[in-house]
Amino acid sequence: MSRLTKSENYGYRDINNIIDTLCGKYACLEKFEAGKSVAGRSINAVRLSYGQTYTLFAAAFHGSEHITGNICLMFLEELAEAYENGGSLEGINIRRALEGRGVIFVPRVNPDGCEIALFGASAAGSRAGEITKQCGGDFSHWNSNLRGIDINHNFDADFAGLKKREAEEGIFTAGKGRFGGSRPESEPETVALVSLCKKENIHHVCAMHTQGEVIYWGYKEHCVSRNKQMAKILAATSGYALNTPVGASFGGGFKDWFVSYFDRPGFTVEFGRGRNPLDTAKALEIYLKAREMLTVCAIL
């Protein structure tokens, strides 16, 4: 197939143009707005088929990890192609495998942060001066939203413990990343995902990050057996390692909240290897290595 999604940097408008084109091409796809960012940018979601339950793929929580949006859209495109035409992906007949089920994609959870990481101060509006100072002029490593809150530390999962660990690591104020804010769900991007999960019957989630080729699975005592079983399958189909987060990386995350709130499986997948931000030119290479895992994750 001729790929619409390329291995190149995509701004907010580019991402939405790709989503609109895909939804126009494939009748099985439907775009809807999950919420809005601090700057008022739409946090768009795409539904592939209506079902009794859904698998949710969410990408680009962190600005410097905007490549995960490319990977997410590459997978969405191929999955829709196979579903629409009764075809297979990684040897699996997608329409048959998803009978009674659907998949929801959120390719860019943090559109403001991605714009800052890609385009610098011009994307930061009235906060341009403050953000320039916070990141020392190197915008490419910006992970937070427009207010300097790390979205993946802003969910209501052991938030008190997260704040304690932040303090131990000297993280006290808003900045380019790792600060979870003063309270959970203080940010509209966080609220958008929480609302989406509460509205739809999400069976399990895959939070897409970079880097390390690692799968973080489960959270505390919740859904341990099912989580572990699924994690082993995802690892076997990708070659990625299984691990658990430590320090200020533990708690406050989307996967942590989903698993603890619903007692259902959730995974944080760190795609690719290297140092963030990964070279967007490698998006297709990273996607192809992970495609079997993503396909299996969609249908488990």
Regions found by a protein language model. Name each.
Residues 1-18, 25, 159-300:
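C-terminal accessory segments enriched in acidic
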Residues 21-32:
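A domain-start/cap signature at the N-terminus of enzymes
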